[in-house]
From Swiss-Prot:
It is an enzyme of class 3 (hydrolase). GO terms for biological process: positive regulation of translation. Its EC number is 3.6.5.n1. Keywords: Cell inner membrane, Cell membrane, GTP-binding, Hydrolase, Membrane, Nucleotide-binding, Protein biosynthesis. It holds the Pfam family GTP_EFTU_D2. GO terms for molecular function: GTP binding; GTPase activity; guanosine tetraphosphate binding; ribosome binding; translation elongation factor activity. This is Elongation factor 4.
Length: 597
């Protein structure tokens, strides 16, 4: 066991985490040069294109060190994005060490810090590495200073390397072997194995990626999943080099995969503990929690006959993504669709993109909302994730909204504009600290403000230099109201939004004005109104198209003209009673693009 090293790589997006992983795999001969490709651990197309890692992957490598010993290195690739922070914490708790990769030309950024703190809390040994030192603008001294200031770990002996050219990668592995402790654990104790990740394979069912903490796991063992108490028979165990290679057993300290004929992903939850039926472990490994969606949106097929296809696509996606939730929903305006729950905005974008790419779906997405807690007058508390389900205001005692703590990092010249943005978004400043040229701001901001367009606005006010991460803090009472949009005094449920009262007038006016541009003129007047409860706060009219009925009167008596105009008016009135206004697709997208001033 002294020769095993379990480690993962922590980095901000684009600091070269996947490239470094590629180099380490190549150096240890995990794949032949022919099989080697860029970002070998990012298996989804969308991961490669966006340059992000979504699912955790592993590679078991053997490396002959300079001291002549052969070490088994288990690389556990973690997602870097805040939406997947639970996956990150599970991957890190399976390791004893982590390589902290910092881009020498950019210094420390938000997600590096967030994941690094997670690692330190879990007691993982952090080994700093400076990447991209081959770039002309690299400034290693400044980067070292930032690591020490912001994260507070000693970085004087940080290993410089360039994952692109391969220079210094061997030093990185040597530093890793020297600094990271070998795993502790007893191969003869009752089995405890942590599920780091799980995904669905069409041939064998669910494949679980596990880190064996104590005990030994062999094929034909009867195992128990401790979170939900289900029992399964192990069919195969093995390791990834990233290719899968079967093994006879996985012992304490090793990382590998387990196939046990599980049919659905819900059974194998990330963070759960596996133990054997013969000798049960006394307690599960700590840290397991159910992942709860934070952001909800409605997904509707453009063509009504695509509903079943959408359900199938969502079910297939859920096979590989246990944190995706969905339930059927009916909207008067959009027909049948699904209310989906996501971990965060990036997760939502990825799911939408995968539906459109892998399953050829055409989708309409409603505005993303967060989960509100509503205290009713009769003392009950309900959760509302869909504005259309918000109860009648007269029955509501108080509405609580989720507040998140946001950490922002940016060069100091952008501080002013970022603070202005946070204040607009109803943020309250908690902390501000300077680290060299970088500034760290901590704010508490309502989550509802973040899901709308905070990230895009942050990037535009800081010219792309600011980076952020956020975590849920608590629910707080807030004066939020539901703004309904009425078209010819009919509510359009898909257009309702929940906003803060201070912003509701403006929001209502903006949406009504936007709808007026988008809804085509009809044969009769269309009234667009924004309402809070029974109070109308804004109104716009779309004027009717009308024929010039007086064209045939040459001069003549006024009563004749009046008669024709009255007749036209009566006809329009009749049409308005029976006519329905078709709301074009763009209208639903327009709601997402209303700027908050």
């Amino acid at each position: 066991m002294d020769h095993i090293r379990n480690f993962s790589i922590i980095a901000h997006i684009d600091h070269g985490k996947s490239t470094l992983a590629d180099r380490i795999i190549q150096l240890c001969g995990g794949l032949s040069d022919r099989e080697m490709e860029a970002q070998v651990l990012d298996s989804m197309d969308i991961e490669k294109e966006r340059g992000i890692t979504i699912k955790a992957q592993t590679a078991a490598l053997s490396y002959k060190a300079r001291d002549g010993k052969v070490y088994n290195l288990n690389l556990i690739d973690t997602p870097g994005h805040v939406d997947f922070s639970y996956e990150v914490s599970r991957s890190l708790s399976a390791c004893e060490g982590a390589l902290l990769v910092v881009d020498a030309s950019q210094g420390v950024e938000a997600q590096t810090v967030a994941n690094c703190y997670t690692a330190i809390e879990l007691g993982v040994e952090v080994v700093p590495v400076l990447n991209k030192i081959d770039l002309p603008q690299a400034d290693p001294d400044n980067a070292i200073q930032e690591i020490e200031d912001v994260i507070g770990i000693d970085a004087q002996d940080a290993t410089p390397c360039s994952a692109k050219t391969g220079q210094g990668v061997q030093d990185v592995i040597e530093a890793l072997i020297a600094k990271v402790p070998p795993p502790e654990g007893d191969a003869d104790a009752p089995l405890q194995a942590l599920i780091i990740d799980s995904w669905f394979d069409n041939y064998v069912g669910v494949v679980m990626l596990v880190r064996v903490v104590n005990g030994t796991l062999r094929p034909k063992d009867k195992v128990l999943l401790m979170a939900n108490g289900s029992q399964h028979l192990v069919e195969q165990v093995g390791v990834f080099t990233p290719k899968s290679i079967p093994r006879d057993a996985l012992t304490a300290g090793q990382v590998g995969f387990v196939i046990a004929g599980i049919k659905e992903l819900k059974a194998a939850k990330v963070g759960d503990t596996i133990t054997t039926m013969q000798r049960k472990a006394e307690a599960p490994l700590p840290g397991f929690k159910e992942v709860k969606p934070q952001v909800f949106a409605g997904l509707y097929p453009v063509e009504a006959n695509q509903y079943e296809a959408l359900r199938e696509s969502l079910e297939k996606l859920r096979l590989n993504d246990a944190s995706l939730m969905f339930e059927p929903e009916v909207s008067q305006a959009l027909g049948f669709g699904f209310r989906c729950g996501f971990l965060g905005l990036l997760h939502m974008e990825i799911v939408q993109e995968r539906l459109e790419r892998e399953f050829d779906m055409d989708l309409i997405t409603t505005a993303p909302t967060v989960v509100y807690q509503v205290e009713m007058r009769d003392g009950t508390v309900i959760t509302v994730e869909n504005p259309a389900k918000m109860p009648d205001p007269s029955k509501i005692e108080a509405i609580l909204e989720p507040i998140v703590t946001v950490n922002l990092y940016m060069p100091q010249e952008y501080v002013g504009s970022v603070i202005t943005l946070c204040t607009q978004k109803r943020g309250s400043q908690i902390n501000m600290s300077y680290h060299g040229k970088q500034v760290q701001l901590t704010y508490e901001i309502p989550m509802a403000e973040i899901v709308m367009d905070f990230f895009d606005r942050l990037k535009s006010v800081s010219r792309g230099y600011a980076s952020m991460d956020y975590e849920f803090k608590e629910y707080r009472p807030s004066d939020v109201v539901k703004v309904d949009i009425l078209i010819n005094s009919d509510k359009v449920d898909a257009l309702s939004v929940i906003v803060h009262r201070s912003n509701s007038q403006y929001r209502g006016r903006e949406v009504a004005a936007k709808m007026r541009e988008i809804i085509p003129r009809q044969m009769y007047d269309v009234a667009i109104q924004a309402a809070i409860g029974a109070n109308i706060i804004a109104r716009e009219n779309v004027k009717a198209l009308r024929k010039n009925v007086l064209a045939k009167c040459y001069g003549g008596d006024i009563t004749r003209k009046k008669k024709l105009l009255e007749k036209q008016k009566a006809g329009k009135k009749r049409m308005k009673q029976v006519g329905t206004v078709e709301i074009p697709q763009e209208a639903f997208l327009a709601i997402l693009q209303v700027d908050d001033k």
